[in-house]
């Protein structure tokens, strides 16, 4: 396991670094996947978006796929869409992540994917609209 600020801080740090095995160990040890870190963010909000496996582990252990950043109203699906990580976006969506919620600027995840030129992500989001 990681060492540092305790299990909750370690989980956020491991998720942010995409450390699948450390995330697995911490979750199996009972660390709360929804606990806020010292910056007021949850592991699923700070996770390495390119690691769909980290997302899947957090979600399997009860992470909330719809937690919103209090300042920007972005959710993990917004982040995955903006960065173009289709596998992570699909994992979030399958776990109940809402694709129809706007951020503080009125943008949907599909808008962010299109702005960044992530055609495969935008195509998925358009195809699943209305789920």
From Swiss-Prot:
ANK repeats lie at residues 6-35, 39-67, 72-101, 105-131. SUPFAM superfamilies: Ankyrin repeat. InterPro entries: Ank_Repeat/CDKN_Inhibitor, Ankyrin_rpt, Ankyrin_rpt-contain_sf. One of its GO terms (biological process) is regulation of G1/S transition of mitotic cell cycle. The keyword Coiled coil does not apply. Gene3D superfamilies: Ankyrin repeat-containing domain. The keyword Cell cycle applies. GO terms for molecular function: cyclin-dependent protein serine/threonine kinase inhibitor activity; protein kinase binding. Keywords: ANK repeat, Cell cycle, Repeat, Tumor suppressor. Pfam families: Ank_2 (PF12796). PROSITE patterns: ANK_REP_REGION, ANK_REPEAT. GO terms for cellular component: cytoplasm; nucleus. Belongs to the CDKN2 cyclin-dependent kinase inhibitor family. Interacts strongly with CDK4 and CDK6. Potent inhibitor. Potential effector of TGF-beta induced cell cycle arrest. Heterodimer of CDKN2B with CDK4 or CDK6. This is Cyclin-dependent kinase 4 inhibitor B.
